């Protein structure tokens, strides 16, 4: 299998609200009020310089990212892509579907929207807290982990934060990875302990050996006709094969159709049992099932 390279950090996506804050600090600086010299965004720490009424973020490797009024003028739901020369566009893409990085209030990690639909839980939580909740259910120090749906990489990063020694993560959509490469909160995807595979998880899992992983996090998009291949008995049997005995699986299901009496978690639980898992139950904090290979 071929690993995906996130590339070096040449451009970053900055929430418009943070751009405004940075320019405000520079105005204070011009009045002789020295602002803090360090700025943290996600997994990145920058030095702050103020040059010609622009904020210049300097990474630890020396790369420079120029934030100007154009970046600050975007709406609150937009992130500006900036590089060494300044504003380069909005953190969005269109290729059959519309993709956009959307910042959240309070400096929380941004979410990804595809055709206006959040790819993360944001009601009553935030993407990072949700990723930690999922990882904490199955990941322990030293574990080898498979994360089947990379997205912006928060779950893989959370697994490393929990002490995983190695994480393989699979993403089917290269545009999603391109946006993750811009996102400062996704920067730790470049950690040498995380290995990214561009491909269909249904096919990629067949390439792993028996008992290859200690834990598996399956966080698919909501169930639909186009994502149904991520909810099949065939795939769950592959999960059972590649997990070691005693290894745990977290499977996000959400609660779609609960009001209408539909029960996706129950259906998934039945298929997991048929695949050989013991289902330990539904974990409301993470809105998914935990199962173990006995």
Task: Label the model's feature ranges.
Residues 1-105:
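N-terminal auxiliary segments of SAM/dcSAM-dependent transferases
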Residues 141-151:
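Conserved class I S-adenosyl-L-methionine
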Residues 152-164:
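Conserved SAM-binding loop of SAM-dependent methyltransferases across substrates and taxa
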Residues 166-171:
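Conserved SAM-binding motif I beta-strand of class I
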Residues 172-210:
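S-adenosyl-L-methionine
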Residues 231-245:
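A short glycine-rich, Lys/Arg-flanked "PGG" loop and its adjoining helix->strand segment in the class I
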Residues 246-253:
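Conserved beta-strand signature within the Rossmann-like core of class I S-adenosyl-L-methionine
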Residues 257-294:
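Class I S-adenosyl-L-methionine
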């Amino acid at each position: 299998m071929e690993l995906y390279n996130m590339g070096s950090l040449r451009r970053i996506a900055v929430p418009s609200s943070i751009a405004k804050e940075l320019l405000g600090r520079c105005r204070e600086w011009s009045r002789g009020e020295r602002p803090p010299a360090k700025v943290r965004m996600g997994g990145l720490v920058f030095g702050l310089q103020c040059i010609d009424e622009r904020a210049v973020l300097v990474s630890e490797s020396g790369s420079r990212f120029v934030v100007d009024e154009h970046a600050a003028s975007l709406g609150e739901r937009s992130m500006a892509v900036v590089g060494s020369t300044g504003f380069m566009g909005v953190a969005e893409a269109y290729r059959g579907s519309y993709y956009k990085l959307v910042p959240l209030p309070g400096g929380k990690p941004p979410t990804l929207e595809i055709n206006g639909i959040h790819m993360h839980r944001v009601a009553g939580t935030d993407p990072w807290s949700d990723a930690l909740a999922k990882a904490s259910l199955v990941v322990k120090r030293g574990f080898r982990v498979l994360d089947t749906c990379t997205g912006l990489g928060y779950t893989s990063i959370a697994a490393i934060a929990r002490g995983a020694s190695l994480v393989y993560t699979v993403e089917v959509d290269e545009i999603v990875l391109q946006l993750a490469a811009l996102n400062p909160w996704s920067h730790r995807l470049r950690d040498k302990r995380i290995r990214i595979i561009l491909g269909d998880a249904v096919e990629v899992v067949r390439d792993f050996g028996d008992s290859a992983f200690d834990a598996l996090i399956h966080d698919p998009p909501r169930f639909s006709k186009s994502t149904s291949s991520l909810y099949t008995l065939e795939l769950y049997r592959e999960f059972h094969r590649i997990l070691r005995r005693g290894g745990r699986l977290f499977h996000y299901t959400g609660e779609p159709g609960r009001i209408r009496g539909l029960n996706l978690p129950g259906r998934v639980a039945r298929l997991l049992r048929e695949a050989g898992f013991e289902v330990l139950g539904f974990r409301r904090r993470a809105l998914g099932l935990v199962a173990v290979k006995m």
